Amino acid sequence: MNSSLTVQRRGSDAELGPWVMAARSKDAALSQRDGVLPVKVEEDSPGSWEPSYPAAWPDPETSRLHFRQLRYQEVAGPEEALSRLRELCRRWLRPELLSKEQILELLVLEQFLTILPEELQAWVREHCPESGEEAVAVVRALQRALDGTSPQGMVTFEDMAVSLTWEEWERLDPARRDFCRESAQKDSGSTVPPSLESRVENKELIPMQQILEEVEPQGQLQEAFQGKHPLFSKCGSTHEDRVEKQSGNPLPLKLENSAEAEGLNSISDVNKNGSIEGEDSKNNELQNSARCSNLVLCQHIPKAERPTDGEEHGNKCKQSFHMVAWHVLKPHKSDSGDSFHHSSFFETQRQLHEERPYKCGNCGKSFKQRSDLFRHQRIHTGEKPYGCQECGKSFSQSAALTKHQRTHTGEKPYTCLKCGERFRQNSHLNRHQSTHSRDKHFKCEECGETCRISNLFRHQRLHKGERPYKCEECKKSFKQRSDLFKHHRIHTGEKPYGCSVCGKRFNQSATLIKHQRIHTGEKPYKCLECGERFRQSTHLIRHQRIHQNKMLSVGRGAHACNPSPLGGQGRRII
């Protein structure tokens, strides 16, 4: 059996998917820049493992979720469970494609996202970071946004699709910066005049007129209006419907606010706040730190060549052009016409618009993955496969069991950085941290209670008596939309929550939980006076009144009559 150094492509680019293609192209380009040819040591053995049907494999993130969410109850036995885990892990980490360092980076990145606070996890995962450095940069950008720091002086580049200060950009390896620009230009198939590129690098001011003069002699202006030039990207959004493609505050070198085409002749028409200035300020040059992307340039196109005609052109232009810095390209396009800086954003857009084939037969809710449907159906069936070994309490989700077990172990993994107090759950830490940051909360003028802005409006309805959600059947009104949905089940007779033991069905999940205690014998409510336990809180309250009445009767007997030294008359002690 001979060993040889081979450079082999396993499958076509379409089979590998955008995630693996991006990782391979970046690593290969950087290696070639350093004069190193990436090779892979393989054995020329007919029995060497090859991936089966790679074209049918899901993307690595989906495989990771399947690997982490696989449950023993879903397989026939321990052998199948181990085999499934090995196959899912191979589909996730793809050892035949990625190096050991890349696999380690994936594992470290996953653990980093896992230990993030819950409020940060969702935001960071939405940006699909492909390395630990990208994840750190996204977290830092979010922290700056939450702290209210100004985004001025920031620059965005395609390789990371996150915001960096000019100082951080300048500290990057020059080879990495050059690679980012060269890769962006290769992806777009166009180049930018060196004179303009150098001026952007030096943070100089460039009027729109000079940009047009530099681009037009090269025959690229028409390409720009067709969306082929890296200076521009074309989208199908309207001026009113335009939404930001990246979360957080708008970044400089990008006009995040779409401007009306009418009366807009140069970039200088947009001030630092992203708004359009008057005619007198047309000659003012835009600071690089201003918010300068998504600037509608339709005004520069001759009317005969404009893609739409009539009055709707200024309000609903289907081919509006948006100004973008040339090292911040948007090469990935979705079916809706929107362009994205990074393949991960394009993948997120694709997932948002793809169909949800797995539908719940009880409530009609749809899901993209079968595993999500299985978890959802436990709400209706009342199934709780995860049991606590200490007290026997069961849960429908493994995460809920993990949180519950901390009550037995005493583990408190969440620490307040300001006072050092520890908590079992992240939500408890968040609630505690609000006591340190009262200035970020809003105070109710009626009762003085402080709460977040999202809860303030809901809280104020308690004082106003406002009930904006009305039932069309019986005209009954409710303060919360969720209460109206629950009430509708009375009229429709819908009972989506069924007991898995006796088959009895209920219209509310809380009622099902109370009913299941009959089968499990669970009595979570304990009287502190006598130690007696109850299944429902209402039973405990009724029982506590017995102790209260006894205390009142004993108090009246001891203090009802007290001999008076004045005349032997009794007096009542109040």
UniProtKB/Swiss-Prot annotation:
C2H2-type zinc finger span:
358-380, 386-408, 414-436, 442-463, 469-491, 497-519, 525-547
Q: Which GO terms describe its molecular function?
A: DNA-binding transcription factor activity, RNA polymerase II-specific; RNA polymerase II cis-regulatory region sequence-specific DNA binding; zinc ion binding
| Gene3D superfamilies named among the record's database cross-references | 6.10.140.140, Classic Zinc Finger, DNA breaking-rejoining enzymes
| Residues bearing PTM Phosphoserine | 12
Q: List, as start-end ranges, the regions of compositional bias called Polar residues.
A: 265-274
Domain KRAB residues, every copy? 155-230
Question: What this chain does, per the record?
Answer: May be involved in transcriptional regulation.
* Domain SCAN box per the UniProt entry, residue ranges: 64-146
Enumerate the residue ranges of region (Disordered): 182-202, 231-284
Which PROSITE patterns did the record assign?
KRAB, SCAN_BOX, ZINC_FINGER_C2H2_1, ZINC_FINGER_C2H2_2
Q: Its family?
A: Belongs to the krueppel C2H2-type zinc-finger protein family.
Q: What is this protein called?
A: Zinc finger protein 394
- Where is this gene product found? Nucleus
Q: Which InterPro entries match?
A: KRAB (IPR001909), KRAB_dom_sf (IPR036051), SCAN_dom (IPR003309), SCAN_sf (IPR038269), Znf_C2H2_sf (IPR036236), Znf_C2H2_type (IPR013087)
Q: What cellular component terms from Gene Ontology apply here?
A: nucleus
User: Which chain positions lie within coiled-coil regions?
Assistant: none
Q: What is its main location?
A: nucleus
Q: Which UniProt keywords apply?
A: DNA-binding, Isopeptide bond, Metal-binding, Nucleus, Phosphoprotein, Repeat, Transcription, Transcription regulation, Ubl conjugation, Zinc, Zinc-finger
Cross-link Glycyl lysine isopeptide (Lys-Gly) (interchain with G-Cter in SUMO2) maps to 40, 203, 228, 254, 282, 443
Per the UniProt record, the lineage of the source organism begins with: Eukaryota, Metazoa, Chordata, Craniata, Vertebrata
The record, for SMART domains, names: KRAB, SCAN, ZnF_C2H2
Organism, by scientific name, is: Pongo abelii (Sumatran orangutan)
Record bears the keyword Calcium: no
